[in-house]
Regions:
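ABC ATPase nucleotide-binding domains
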Residues: 30, 71-77, 81-225
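The feature captures the beta-strand-to-loop junction immediately N-terminal to the Walker
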Residues: 34-36
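ABC ATPase nucleotide-binding domain helices that frame the ATP-binding cleft
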Residues: 42-45, 141
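Helix-to-loop junction immediately C-terminal to a conserved catalytic motif
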Residues: 49
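Conserved ABC transporter NBD signature motif
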Residues: 57-65
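Non-catalytic connector elements of ABC transporters
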Residues: 247-355
Length: 355
């Protein structure tokens, strides 16, 4: 592993920001640290950068223990949420700053700045000041400045949080392409699931100072290992007793479960008569219908259980109070600190592929 964190602990007073955190990162990977506020993700980033000192544990970069190395000797570039550009310096001087500190010659600095401005797609803004740039442009320049000294590791702390939604989405793709192009090992902090899933090679899910799960975006989404991950990733609803649902009646012991909208199929009452799994469908009443662009989001009540599913735009419209039939295809069962996928028995027994 190129980066290794081994049994890292960090507290701020009574608050445990990192609780025995251990994981490794391969060289050249783009890793997303994803979790709610206060979960410890930014603390991990700051300890890697040498801006915070861990209470115990080891940080290894390229086979070298960096516990005692100051931040300026770790070979790390850091991009902050607030850009942290010097407002009184031109774009050129902002990018050149780290190179001047390294006492590089003027010819090298000029060439390197030109390369980076080309890399970030802003070759003509060198003479401008930060306040003459848009938020997206400023973040690109902040990345160029971080890359200027040719670091071995790039750290990004919620780099797109201060940018509007449309530009943020464009910058995700740009960041992914840029990092692929230069091949630098990178770690970024985010609380935005879409951002982590779209950009990262692997995601580290943090919660209350601990690592809940590590995996690629598909694994994290489809195979959550803990109840927290199952609830945190995607749009999820907790069901207290899933044994009351058709196809799941044989449940024993703890019967809490998590259901996502994509696990649910909603049909108008009168359209379900010839459905192959009609006998396994629940009667429900529509509580609310919301337009979501490419589909409708329907909240419905099965007895006292509230569920949310998707409903196609080209189907007959639903409204509050309509009776519908609901097929719950699968769910995630919750058993203490683990989750398991449980498929509706009718579908599991059928030769039809329906999930």
């Amino acid at each position: 592993m190129y980066i290794e964190l081994k049994n890292i602990n960090k507290s701020f007073g009574d608050f445990k920001a990192s609780d025995n955190v251990s994981f490794g990162i391969e060289k050249g990977k783009l890793i997303g640290l994803l979790g709610p506020s206060g979960s410890g993700k930014t603390t991990i980033l700051r300890m890697l950068a040498g801006l915070e000192k861990q209470d115990s544990g080891d940080i290894i970069i390229d086979g070298k223990n960096v516990n005692k190395l100051p931040s300026n000797e770790r070979g790390i570039g850091f991009v902050f949420q607030s850009y942290a550009l010097f407002p009184f310096m031109t774009v050129y001087d902002n990018i050149a700053y780290g190179l001047k500190v390294q006492k590089k010659d003027k010819k090298f600095i000029k060439q390197r700045v030109a390369e980076l401005l080309e890399l970030v797609g802003l070759p003509d803004v060198g003479k401008r000041y930060p306040d003459q740039l848009s938020g997206g442009q400023r973040q690109r320049i902040a990345l160029a400045r971080a890359l200027a000294p040719q670091p071995e590791l790039l750290l990004l702390d919620e780099p797109f949080a201060a940018i509007d939604a449309k530009v943020r989405k464009e910058l995700r793709t740009w960041l992914r392409d840029t990092i692929d192009k230069i091949g630098i090992t990178s770690i970024f902090v985010t609380h935005d699931q879409d951002e982590a899933i779209e950009v990262a090679d692997e995601i580290v899910i943090t919660n209350r100072g601990r690592v809940e799960q590590i995996g690629n975006p598909v694994e994290i989404y489809l195979e959550p290992k803990t109840p927290f991950v199952a609830q945190f990733i995607g749009q999820s609803a907790v069901i207290e007793d899933y044994s009351k649902l058709k196809g799941f009646e044989t449940a024993e012991g703890k019967t809490s479960a998590i259901i996502r909208p994509e696990f649910i199929e909603i049909n108008k009452f009168e359209d379900s008569e010839y459905h192959p799994f009609e006998s396994s469908m629940e009667d429900a009443v529509v509580e609310d219908v919301s337009f979501r662009g490419n589909s409708f989001e329907v909240r419905a009540l099965i007895d006292n259980i509230s569920i949310t599913g998707r409903y196609p735009l080209n189907a007959s419209r639903l409204k509050k109070g309509d009776k519908v039939k609901v097929l719950i295809k699968k769910l995630y069962t919750i058993d203490e600190n683990t989750t398991n996928i449980l498929v509706n028995k009718a579908l599991d027994d059928s030769e039809l592929y329906y999930i």
